[in-house]
């Protein structure tokens, strides 16, 4: 039987919208923008399962709950992708690449994928503790989710070698809800889409300005060249007349 460790006192330590199962289970499930899948995951043996809508504080809460339970070694990301936030892809990017010095998730495509309250050390702990992230993004098949959870349990490597890491996210964030208490706040997927598109438009405007500047310089150069040529032609013609 795989070795187990005690999770942090009062686990899960970060509040949110989730269902808790056996804290000694090696599997945790994120159901992204879907609802009605969590009970199925718990019935299959998951330690915790719940949705996650935002690519900043929402992800932080998931990370904090995972690293405070060293028994969690597998992460299943399933359910419908959250438009604008693209939370599922952000989870994958975080697991594969970590965060930069500015707290940004490297390679994430969400609107504002920044870790305000979780630094590089907790992220590294998350990357080391989770042995596999199973990508089931956009799947809402309860049967497949349950089978995936069971497959992970059959490969349980035992608890992570280090004890639970506790991050006081509530104290830092100062809020209670998933999307409250952080200086980075997305009010809706629609706003995230707008902000993402605004950034794309801004880049396109910059590129257009560069092209326009080049074309303007090229055009001005042609005018100057014609003027100089005409002047020299008139000068030579005048000299010939003399």
Curated annotation (Swiss-Prot):
Cytoplasmic topological domain ranges are 1-221
One Pfam family, please name it.
MtrA
Q: Which residues of this UniProt protein bind 5-hydroxybenzimidazolylcob(I)amide? A: 85
Q: How does the cofactor bind to this protein, according to its record?
A: Binds 1 5-hydroxybenzimidazolylcobamide group.
Compartmental location: Cell membrane
Q: Which reaction does it catalyse?
A: 5-methyl-5,6,7,8-tetrahydromethanopterin + coenzyme M + 2 Na(+)(in) = 5,6,7,8-tetrahydromethanopterin + methyl-coenzyme M + 2 Na(+)(out)
Primary location class: membrane
> Which biological process annotations from GO are given for this protein?
methanogenesis, from carbon dioxide; methylation; one-carbon metabolic process
- Pathway of action: One-carbon metabolism; methanogenesis from CO(2); methyl-coenzyme M from 5,10-methylene-5,6,7,8-tetrahydromethanopterin: step 2/2
Q: Which GO terms describe its molecular function?
A: cobalt ion binding; tetrahydromethanopterin S-methyltransferase activity
Task: Specify the protein's topology with respect to the membrane.
Answer: Single-pass membrane protein
As for family, the record states:
Belongs to the MtrA family.
Q: Quaternary form?
A: The complex is composed of 8 subunits; MtrA, MtrB, MtrC, MtrD, MtrE, MtrF, MtrG and MtrH.
Q: What is this protein called?
A: Tetrahydromethanopterin S-methyltransferase subunit A
Species annotation: Methanococcus voltae (strain ATCC BAA-1334 / A3)
């Amino acid at each position: 039987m795989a070795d187990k460790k005690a999770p942090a006192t009062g686990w899960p330590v970060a509040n949110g919208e989730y269902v808790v199962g056996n804290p000694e289970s090696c599997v945790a499930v994120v159901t992204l923008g879907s609802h009605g899948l969590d009970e199925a995951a718990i019935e299959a043996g998951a330690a915790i399962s719940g949705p996650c809508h935002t690519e900043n504080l929402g992800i932080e809460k998931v990370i904090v709950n995972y690293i405070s339970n060293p028994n969690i070694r597998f992460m299943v990301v399933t359910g419908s992708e959250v438009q604008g936030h693209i939370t599922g892809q952000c989870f994958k990017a975080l697991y594969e690449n970590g965060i930069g010095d500015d707290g940004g998730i490297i390679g994430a495509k969400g609107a504002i994928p920044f870790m305000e309250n979780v630094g590089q050390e907790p992220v590294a702990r998350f990357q080391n503790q989770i042995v596999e992230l199973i990508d089931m993004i956009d799947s809402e098949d309860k049967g497949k989710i349950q089978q995936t959870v069971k497959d992970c349990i059959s490969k349980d490597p035992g608890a992570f070698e280090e004890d639970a890491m506790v991050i006081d996210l509530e104290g830092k964030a100062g809020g209670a809800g998933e999307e409250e208490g952080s200086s980075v706040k997305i009010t809706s997927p629609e706003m995230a889409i707008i902000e993402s598109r605004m950034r794309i438009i801004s880049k396109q405007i910059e590129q257009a300005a560069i092209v326009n500047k080049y074309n303007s310089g090229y055009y001005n150069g042609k005018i100057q060249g014609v003027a100089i040529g005409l002047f020299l032609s008139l000068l030579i013609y005048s000299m010939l007349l003399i």
